[in-house]
């Protein structure tokens, strides 16, 4: 959960976020919101704030990709959800391949999905698993034009 209540977020944080997003849009830029943890209590305000993307979508924090996609639809691009807590450090390349395939099945419909780690590619991530994530994304993640 966020460190502050949704009410305080709306009062003290989001007005400034909106100004940043609006200015970026005036400059022709896209804006991705990076916010760790469980974002459900802020999801509606984040969607209304005009962000183009939401990152990192941590499965260990309750941000199941299929559920987030069902809720958000095509209103925002989703980035992340390949577990960097256990899977990328300690899993096998085959397990990573399976997780990427599942993420794409869960959230690629209609576009708006960028596969990446659920937070970062930190020093504990097994390089072979990082490569497996990239390769699986290429294998399963192309859209037919």
Language model features with spans:
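Active-site loop segments of alpha/beta catalytic cores
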Residues: 1-145
